[in-house]
Amino acid sequence: LAGQAVELPAKTSAFRDWAERLRAFAGDGGLDGELAYWQGQLQGASSDLPCLDPLGDQSNRHARSVSCGLDAEATRQLLQEAPAAYRTQVNDLLLTALARVICRWTGQVDALIQLEGHGREELFAEIDLTRTVGWFTSLFPLRLTPAEGIAASIKGIKEQLRAVPNKGIGFGALRYLGSAASQAALAGLPVPRITFNYLGQFDGSFAMEEGALFVPAGERAGDDQSPDAPLANWLALNGRIYGGELRIDWSFSGERFEIASIQRLADAYRDELLALIAHCRVAEGQGLTPSDFPLARLDQARLDQLPLAPCEVEDLYPLSPMQQGMLFHSLYQQEAGDYINQLRVDVDGLHPESFRAAWQAALDEHDVLRSGFLWQGAFETPLQVVRKRVEVPFSVLDWRGREDLAAALDELAAGEGRLGFDLSEAPLLRLVLVRTDEERYHLIYTN
């Protein structure tokens, strides 16, 4: 369009190369380690749904659709506010609401859902799919088990979603490309009757005010499949955000479900999603889950005993061997002060507030400067705790004209050293800036 020569980047892997590599990988047992996981998702699961006629015709000619959605403000809250409470993604909340509504509808304790993934997983170092044209979508089942309360439901389903290996691509590969034993093991298990797919935000792709070349057409596109072709599933949910509003379309066969029944279900889903958003926006609606800190290897029970508010915690991870030794000696030989370091310097022409702001910026940037330790109670294995935000301990004293200045500075520094640190409280440093003359300051930095 600009009249310039087209320069294309290097070609990425072909769809055929990917397909052949995946077939060989699955056939050679490369995904057999996932088989037990997928069997666990399906064995004993119920796929029954309340319907008009379980044998009703599933062809496209009987396709019906209802929808539900959120207005712009509720959608903004879903995208920008609600995820912070439990460190979730939008999909976590959408599926939590769906699982709770489906379980109430069916009377079951869990909901068997088929999910879609983009399928472009990085399984092979020699395969690059970043610019490869093709339909790689992977389908996989997940048995979601909501709890009675909203908080426990969000945490539990978030963890179930994080536990899916390789983002679900292994199920289809094992079911259709794996060994004969793997295919047989999965073939006779229940099949999800509900498919859920959240397509994401389309506002950025079709931003008319930014001069997008293509925008959605207002007219109907016509049928994209034969009327005799089967529908994708008993219930197929497709969600997207466009024009700042979330919309979920529910597709089904009118021979199998009543339109009014599915519309009530869709409305119940919208109400449940609004309840989840409202819960996440209040202070008590907050929590951490084990997948937030994989290196810490904590279960939910111990994580719930953290002596910090969830919103204060940036990260948790084990101590290095050297840190473990230093912590041990610091705790059992507290009077020795072997690991207390101190730096004292005289500085001319310093601006105290700018100096404090520079230190605060350093703490904001570097995790290690916002770190403390946990070792008591449920945390028999010490952990390093990185806080999201800490204020730099910074004090300024004006001792201009003091006759005993040298001795007073020595005593002040010694007192700072004797004071030590509470190793559970970050940051493990203090700065004292003493003004000793009009343009001179004495800095005592203790850590």
Short names for language-model regions:
Residues 72-88, 252, 361:
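Surface-exposed, Lys/Arg-rich phosphate-binding patches that contact polyanionic backbones
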Residues 70, 144-146, 250-254, 345-349, ...:
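Short beta-strand-to-loop capping motifs
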Residues 11-35, 81-95, 99, 104-224, ...:
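His-Asp-centered acyl/peptidyl-transfer active-site segments
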Residues 1, 109-116, 147-154, 171-172, ...:
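Extended, hydrophobic beta-loop-alpha segments that form or line the acyl/peptidyl-thioester binding
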Residues 435-444:
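Conserved catalytic micro-motifs used in adenylation/nucleotidyl-transfer and phosphoryl/amide-
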Residues 238-242, 374-376, 434-436:
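Short beta-strand micro-motifs enriched in acidic
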Residues 2-4, 9-64, 292-334, 356-407, ...:
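Short amphipathic alpha-helices and their capping loops
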